[in-house]
Amino acid sequence: MNQIHSTILKKGILNIKPQIRNITKCTNTINYNNNNINNRYFTSINKNKNIENLLQQQPQQQPQQQLQQQPILFVQNQNNINYFKREYTNIGGTSPNRQSVPENSTTKTTATATVETDNVVNSSTTFTLPKEVEEEIIDKNERGKEQEQENKQQKEQKDDNKSGSIFSIKGWLTISILSVLALGTKLVIDPPQNIDKLDLAFIRNLRVLYAGFKITFYYKYYLMGLNRGDEGFAENIQIAHKLAAKAMVDLCYQNKGIFIKVAQIIASLDHILPQEYIKSLSIFQDHAPFVTFEEVEKLFKIETGKHPDDMFIDFERLPINSASLAQVHKAKLKLENDEIIEVAVKVQYPGLMNKFQKDMDSLDNVLTYITLFFPSFQFSWILGEASSCLSQELDFVNEAKNSEKMKQLFIGNQQLSIPKVYWNHTTKRILTMEFIHGVRIDNREGLDKLGIDLKELYYLFSDIFAQQIFVHGFLHSDPHPGNLLVRKTPNGKPDLVLLDHGLYKKIDENVRLDFCHLWKSLCLGDAKTSEFYAERLGAGIYAKHLGILLNLNPSKSRENLRNMKRELKDQTLVVINEILKNLPKEILLVLKTNNLIRQITTHFGIENGFLNMAKTCIKGIYTGNDIITKLKYYLTLCIFNIEIKVIDFIKKRKPPQVEIPSTYHHHH
C-alpha cells in the first residue's frame, strides 16, 4: 500500500470550502507544516500529538475503488454539513468510500480525510475530536460571529455619519423620484382645462422641484461626513452656498414673478444669511426680467379696453425699470387744462394673479422637501406671511391708497416727496403716477454731484422710517435703495422721494409701545429691561438674542452674530426660527427696514446713527398732545441724552469693558 498522504488540522479545520479537482492552496489562518508536495497532492503533518495518536488508534481500511475526484478535506460541523451535502451529493456517485453525513448530526464535530493515490482510494479515516479541541473550535466560531456582527454595526454607523441625516443618499434620491411621480400623477388626474396652462404649470413646478433637489444634493455632497469645526468644513460649505445660490438665481430668473420677490426678500437678510446668497440674489434688486410691449398691450386691452397710445402721449415701448411684480414705462399725459406732464406707468406682469397661488404652493413644497434633510431649517411658516403681503402688492388700487395715506401722515414735512396718483388712469393692474427725477440713495457719486450732505441725508432718511415705526405705526414694508430717490429742495436741503407703496403694515398699538421701550433699552445697553420687553413681544427664552437680529450698531452686527453662533453652535438657525416665528408679524417687516437702515448707515460711514432713531422712539412713547405728556417727553429725552453721553465717555476711557449698543452682548 502506497504511503498514505494525510492532512490533519492542528486544532480543527473550520469553514474551508472543499475543492473538487485540485487542492492548490490553503488559508493563511491554518498552520501547516509542509513536508512534501507532488504534482497531485498536498501533504502536511500536524504536530498535534493527541490527534495523531487518535488517528492511529482508529484506522478503518476501506476497499480500493476507482474514483473520479480529487482528495476532499472538510470539517463536519453545524455550519458546513448542509453546505457539503449540497455541493457533493452528486459527485462520484454513492461510493461507499465517502463518509456518510447524517443531516441531523450536529452534536459532535468530526473530521474525515479521504486520501487518493493514483486514482485509487487507499484509506478513509474518521475520528472524533477531543472535547477541549471541539470547544475551542466552537468558541472560535462564536467569536468570529460576534466580530462579524460588530464590523457590520460599525459600517452602518459610519454610513449614517456620512449621510449626516436619517436619510441615506439612496433615500433622498428615492424621495426625489417619488416627488416627481406624485407631481405628474396629480397633473394627469386633475389637469387644467387649458393645455397651455398644463404645460406652464408642469414646467414651473418641475423647475422648483429640480432646484430643491440640487440645493439638497450640494449640501449633502460637500458636507458628507463633516461637522462644524472639522478641517475642510468652512471651505466646503462656502462651495455649497455658492452652488445653491446659483441654483436659486436660475430658478428665480426662469419662473420670474413671485420668485423674484422671494429673491429680493432673501437678499435683504444680509446679516443672517451667508454672503454667497446675498451677492448672487442682489441682482434682482434692480434688474428683473421684463415682458414685451405686446404683452403690455394685451393687459391694457383687458384692464381699460384701450391701447396705451389712446391714453398717453409718447408711451415708451421699453420699460425704464423692471421689478418682481411689474415694470415701469415712461409716458406723457395730457391733463384737463391741456398741460402735458411726465408720468410713470406701472404695469403688472400678465398672468401673475393666475400663477400666484400655484407658485406659493410650489415654494411651500420645496421648503418642506428641504426641511426633510435639514431639520433645523424650519422657515416654511414665512410663506404664509409672504402670501398675505404679496396679495396686497398685486392690487395697485391699494398701493395708490397707501401712498395718499403716507402723504397725509407727513403733510408738514417739506423734505419728503411722494408721487401723485392719477386715478383716471389707474386700475388694479395699472398705476399712473407723477414722474420724479432723482438719484438713488446708494449712489454716492450722484449724491456728491448734487452737493448733498450725507450726514444730513441719513438723519432725514432714518427719522422718516423711525416715525413710521415708532410714532405712526404705519410702515413702508418694501424698502430698498431702488425705492428711495434723492433730489434737492429749492433751499438746497436733501429731499427724499419714497416710491413703491404696495406693501404697508399697520403695527398694533401695544406692539408699537413695547418696541419703543425695547429700542430705548437696547441703545442704553440695559440688558434686563431689553429682555423684559423682548419677552413681551414673544421672543420667550431667546429674548436676549433679539437685539442681535435688530443690529442697532452696524459696526458690531457681524461680531455680535458670530458671538451668538459660537454660543448656540448648530442651534443658531433653530433659535432664529423660534424668535421670528413667535414675534408679531409686523416686527418681521421692521427687521427688514432695519436691514436697509443698517446698509445705508454703513454706506454713508455714519457712526452711532441709531441714536437718532432712539430719540424718535422716545417720542413714540409720549405721543399725546397735552402739556403733561409733552413735559414727560422732553424730560425723558434730556435724561436719555445725558445717559448716552456718560456711556460714550466711559466707552472711550475703557473700550474693552463698555461698548455701545453691544454692551449687552456679553450676556449672550
From Swiss-Prot:
Residues 91-105 have a biased composition (Polar residues). One of its GO terms (molecular function) is protein serine/threonine kinase activity. Residues 131-163 form a coiled coil. Keywords: ATP-binding, Coiled coil, Kinase, Nucleotide-binding, Serine/threonine-protein kinase, Transferase. It is an enzyme of class 2 (transferase). InterPro entries: ABC1_dom, ADCK1_dom, Kinase-like_dom_sf, Mito_struct-func_regulator. Residues 88-111, 132-162 are annotated as: Disordered. The active site is at D478. Its EC number is 2.7.11.-. Belongs to the protein kinase superfamily. ADCK protein kinase family. This is Probable serine/threonine-protein kinase abkB. The lineage of its organism: Eukaryota, Amoebozoa, Evosea, Eumycetozoa, Dictyostelia.
